Amino acid sequence: MPAASLRALLAHSIDYAGMFPPCNLALEPALQNHAKYIRESDAWMLSNFILPTGQFAAVSGTLAQFDRKHPLRVSALGSKTETVAAFRPAFEEAFEAIRKFSTEHTGVVSIDQFEMLLPGDVDLAILAEAAGMFGEMKLHVFWETPADTAERAIALLAQHNSKKNVRVLGYKLRTGGVTADAFPSAAHVGGALIAAARNRVPIKFTAGLHHPVRQFRDEVKTKMHGFLNVLGAGVLAAEHDWDEGQISRMLEDENADSFSFDETIFAWREWEIATDRIHARRKLITSFGSCSFDEPREDLQP
């Protein structure tokens, strides 16, 4: 059994994105994998199944492997748009698909999350309009922008969240891909984590976090961020009010011995956070999308 502090840091942390690069599975085998994973002993690490809203209709005939005890928990992914003019109808289409799909499969499918790329010209009014459309739906909403605009986007989301009686909006940071240029610098990742912590904006991540600790990988010809680095830096930075230099040092650490977990404490070097505080900080440091559920958990094995 993993140490309590490790369980706190990684509980429901992996959104399974099997249909996306580099795995690129077809819908049916990806769903079969997810149905298997939610019945395994490591299911405590698993969160949602990333599913584009355009694939909802195709899923309807492949739900026999899910039931009320083992529902398909979905993070719905909206389509990519370049401008607000294109974003508004794309979002409305995604919203209608979510409403319809949820109604048709009550008890077997639970749409817990929505993710979508924001166009560069989005403003506060558009965010409020989009957030308001979800009404009473109980789902978490995350908006993605390029990593070099993360801090500005998080500030905009915080401005929205500061208003009374509004849906809290989160930020989605892309942390990698299949080519070297898809990986943001430690400074960009750290800046986003600090901005999210200081503004109390929920943050999730996607891509490039297959391995626990930062390392060079031949398949992408660059260093990949580690999920222990990123999630760990997120909770420690929030707990200790780190600056950009301190958080970059943790994000760039490639020594697995720097990380230690026991029943009461997670530590990175001399910095510590108690297990109960990890639970509290994880309300804002939420999850990461990965096309593999096997790689992250296998790499954690001693």
Q: Where do the protein language model's features map onto the residues?
A:
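Catalytic alpha/beta core domains of metabolic enzymes, predominantly
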Residues: E151, N165, L169-Q246
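Alpha/beta catalytic barrel-like cores
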Residues: M1-V141, T145, L236-P302
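Domain-core and long-helix interface of multi-subunit machines
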Residues: V122-G191
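General "foldedness" signal
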Residues: L63, R88, A128, A155-L157, ...
